C-alpha cells in the first residue's frame, strides 16, 4: 500500500516519514499562556529536530457541563493564532463545529479539524472539504476504524484529498476508553494510505459517571504514546500545560510542560528506530 503524503508548508505528514508533533494546549485560556506554551514546544522541537504543528481550540463546544469554560471564541481565538504564526512561524491546527466557521478559520490556520462527535455530519464535512484546507478527522469513540473510510470518501467526493486521520480511543463499556493498536493499520487500509496520527491525551480520558468533567490518566501518557509510535504512524497529538491541575479543560490528561523535552526525546528515539526497519512481507 502506498503511503500518501499530506504537505503542511514544508512539513511532510505520512506514515513512513518522521513523526510530526501536533502539540499545544486543549483550549486557549489566554493570549499569554498560548504564547508561553507555543514557545516551549518550538524550543523543544527545534532542538530535537521534530516537525511541529501548534494545536488548541478556540471553542470547546462539546463540554459536558453548561458551566464549563469553552474558550475565547472564534474572533479572539483567530487573533491569537495569527499572532502565534507571526511570532514563531508555526503551522496551526484547530477544530470547527459549525458550517459558518469553516472558511474564516481555514483562512488563518493550516489544518481544520473535524471533531469526533461530529465526524458523520455530512453538511459540516462538505463545508470543511470545500475550503481546500488540510483536514484532520478525529475518529469517533463509537466508530470502528474501518468506518473511517466512509468519512474519507465524503471529503474526497468534494475534491479534497488532503486528509489526516486521528485515533482518540474507543468506548469500552461506559465511561472508559481504550486504544486498539491494530486499528491504526485498519485506518491506513480503509483510507488507502492516508496519514494516521494518535491523540494520546484524549485517549487517557475517563469519566466520572456522576461528574461534570472528565478525569484522566496522565501517569500513563508515556507508555501509551510509545505503543502508538511503535506501530508506525505519522504523528502524535499531545496537550501540555504549565500547571495541569489548574487547566480549564482536561488537565488530568495533560502532560506537565516541564516534562515536554524528555517526552519528545523518547518519542523521537522510538519513531526513528521503528522506521529504520524494513517492512516485512508476511503474505503467503
From Swiss-Prot:
GO terms for biological process: keto-3-deoxy-D-manno-octulosonic acid biosynthetic process. It catalyses: D-arabinose 5-phosphate + phosphoenolpyruvate + H2O = 3-deoxy-alpha-D-manno-2-octulosonate-8-phosphate + phosphate. It is found in: Cytoplasm. GO terms for cellular component: cytosol. Pathway: Carbohydrate biosynthesis; 3-deoxy-D-manno-octulosonate biosynthesis; 3-deoxy-D-manno-octulosonate from D-ribulose 5-phosphate: step 2/3; Bacterial outer membrane biogenesis; lipopolysaccharide biosynthesis. The keyword Cell inner membrane does not apply. Its EC number is 2.5.1.55. InterPro entries: Aldolase_TIM (IPR013785), DAHP1/KDSA (IPR006218), KDO8P_synthase (IPR006269). Its main location: cytoplasm. Keywords: Cytoplasm, Lipopolysaccharide biosynthesis, Transferase. Belongs to the KdsA family. This is 2-dehydro-3-deoxyphosphooctonate aldolase. It comes from Haemophilus influenzae (strain ATCC 51907 / DSM 11121 / KW20 / Rd). The gene is kdsA.
Amino acid at each position: 500500500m502506498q503511503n500518501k503524503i499530506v504537505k503542511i508548508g514544508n512539513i511532510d505528514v505520512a506514515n513512513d516519514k518522521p513523526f510530526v508533533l501536533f502539540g499545544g494546549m486543549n483550549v486557549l485560556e489566554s493570549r499569554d499562556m498560548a504564547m508561553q506554551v507555543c514557545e516551549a514546544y518550538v524550543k523543544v522541537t527545534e532542538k530535537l529536530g521534530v516537525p511541529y504543528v501548534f494545536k488548541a481550540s478556540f471553542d470547546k463546544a462539546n463540554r459536558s457541563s453548561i458551566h464549563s469554560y469553552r474558550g475565547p471564541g472564534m474572533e479572539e481565538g483567530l487573533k491569537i493564532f495569527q499572532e502565534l504564526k507571526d511570532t514563531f512561524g508555526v503551522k496551526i491546527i484547530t477544530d470547527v463545529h459549525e458550517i459558518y466557521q469553516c472558511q474564516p478559520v481555514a483562512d488563518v490556520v493550516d489544518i481544520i479539524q473535524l471533531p469526533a462527535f461530529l465526524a458523520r455530519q455530512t453538511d459540516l464535512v462538505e463545508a470543511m472539504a470545500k475550503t481546500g484546507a488540510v483536514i484532520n478527522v478525529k475518529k469517533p469513540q463509537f466508530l470502528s476504524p474501518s468506518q473511517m473510510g466512509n468519512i474519507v470518501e465524503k471529503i474526497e467526493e468534494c475534491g479534497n484529498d488532503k486528509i489526516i486521520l486521528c485515533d482518540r480511543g474507543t468506548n469500552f463499556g461506559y465511561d472508559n476508553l481504550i486504544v486498539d493498536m491494530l486499528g491504526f493499520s485498519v485506518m491506513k487500509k480503509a483510507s488507502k494510505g492516508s496519514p494516521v496520527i494518535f491523540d494520546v491525551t484524549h485517549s487517557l480520558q475517563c469519566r466520572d459517571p456522576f461528574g461534570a468533567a472528565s478525569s484522566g490518566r496522565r501517569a500513563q501518557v508515556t507508555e501509551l504514546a510509545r505503543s502508538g509510535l511503535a506501530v508506525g504512524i505519522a504523528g502524535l497529538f499531545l496537550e501540555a500545560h504549565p500547571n495541569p491541575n489548574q487547566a480549564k479543560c482536561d488537565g488530568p490528561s495533560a502532560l506537565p510542560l516541564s516534562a515536554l523535552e524528555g517526552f519528545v526525546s523518547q518519542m523521537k528515539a522510538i519513531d526513528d528506530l521503528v522506521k529504520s526497519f524494513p517492512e516485512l512481507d508476511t503474505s503467503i
